[in-house]
Amino acid sequence: MPELPEVETVRRGLEPVITGAKIISITLNRRDLRFPFPEAFSERLVGRTIMELGRRGKYLLFHLSQNETILSHLGMSGSWRIEDDLLRKTYSAAGKFVKHDHFLMDIQAKDGKVYHLTYNDVRRFGFMLLLDTNRIYEHPLLKKLGLEPLSNEFSGRYLQEAFVNKKISLKGVLLDQSIIAGLGNIYVCEALWRSRLSPQRGAFTLALKTVCAREFADSLAQNIRNVIAEAISFGGSTLRDYIRTDGSLGYFQHSFSVYGREGKECFQCGIPITRISQSGRSSFYCSQCQK
């Protein structure tokens, strides 16, 4: 599933072109994704202006004129791409990026040039909703999201407060979107390795009123920030279906220290990386370095 760095990379790829653009036409190649498209979706969008493209956690927010917002979630395999006429003809001629195109939006940018914005989703777990912009953060999907890991408020102290009395694993708490918005399995594994913390460790141990606990919490918060920022700078991680808005791949997967490296040597101590299952998800860690 695309995590915060992948979604932010998409946002940054689309934003310069679509901000201020007018929606010319909409084509729906099916009636639904994970959920049905909003009623009269095409008719309600044509003629609108895309005022701003935002992100909250793993959600993209296309803020439109007339105070409505398209909330887009990429699901497991969704991707957005943007093409001009020449690039679109090249892709079509090559038969590339045509299958599983479910939503197509033609827009006219502020400079008058026409672009084609396409949503592709092999597994169709993504979805789009059309919401009232003024009340969007009251929607159940957004209302309970935690802090953004790159926000000024995110810190070791915040983590300590969030971990109080949490008897479950550190990995489980870090994946809780009501605590940290947008953080997923890949980047939790990477941040924990950098912090030398086991994914099986009880989260409450970082909330203890000791110097050691505070230092671990500060280190973890900083490493989460660093991993997320680095992944964004590399254009995210491509494991299976994720692509950037120009059709290219992300590159952060080449910088993984533990994720997907079961049996390979730990870069720190040399012993094999271990994979375990936690709540149905794979955790990768070094049993020697991470305690």
Curated annotation (Swiss-Prot):
It catalyses: Hydrolysis of DNA containing ring-opened 7-methylguanine residues, releasing 2,6-diamino-4-hydroxy-5-(N-methyl)formamidopyrimidine; 2'-deoxyribonucleotide-(2'-deoxyribose 5'-phosphate)-2'-deoxyribonucleotide-DNA = a 3'-end 2'-deoxyribonucleotide-(2,3-dehydro-2,3-deoxyribose 5'-phosphate)-DNA + a 5'-end 5'-phospho-2'-deoxyribonucleoside-DNA + H(+). SUPFAM superfamilies: Glucocorticoid receptor-like (DNA-binding domain), N-terminal domain of MutM-like DNA repair proteins, S13-like H2TH domain. InterPro entries: DNA_glyclase/AP_lyase_DNA-bd, DNA_glyclase_Znf_dom_DNA_BS, Formamido-pyr_DNA_Glyclase, FPG_cat, MutM-like_N-ter, Ribosomal_uS13-like_H2TH, Znf_DNA_glyclase/AP_lyase, Znf_FPG/IleRS. DNA binds at residues 100, 123, 166. Pfam families: Fapy_DNA_glyco (PF01149), H2TH (PF06831), zf-FPG_IleRS (PF06827). Binds 1 zinc ion per subunit. Gene3D superfamilies: 1.10.8.50, MutM-like, N-terminal. It comes from the Bacteria. Its EC number is 3.2.2.23, 4.2.99.18. A zinc finger (FPG-type) spans 257-291. GO terms for molecular function: 8-oxo-7,8-dihydroguanine DNA N-glycosylase activity; class I DNA-(apurinic or apyrimidinic site) endonuclease activity; damaged DNA binding; zinc ion binding. One of its GO terms (biological process) is base-excision repair. Keywords: DNA damage, DNA repair, DNA-binding, Glycosidase, Hydrolase, Lyase, Metal-binding, Multifunctional enzyme, Zinc, Zinc-finger. The active site is at residues 2-3, 58, 281. Its cofactor is Zn(2+). HAMAP family: Fapy_DNA_glycosyl. Involved in base excision repair of DNA damaged by oxidation or by mutagenic agents. Acts as a DNA glycosylase that recognizes and removes damaged bases. Has a preference for oxidized purines, such as 7,8-dihydro-8-oxoguanine (8-oxoG). Has AP (apurinic/apyrimidinic) lyase activity and introduces nicks in the DNA strand. Cleaves the DNA backbone by beta-delta elimination to generate a single-strand break at the site of the removed base with both 3'- and 5'-phosphates. Belongs to the FPG family. Monomer. This is Formamidopyrimidine-DNA glycosylase. The gene is mutM.
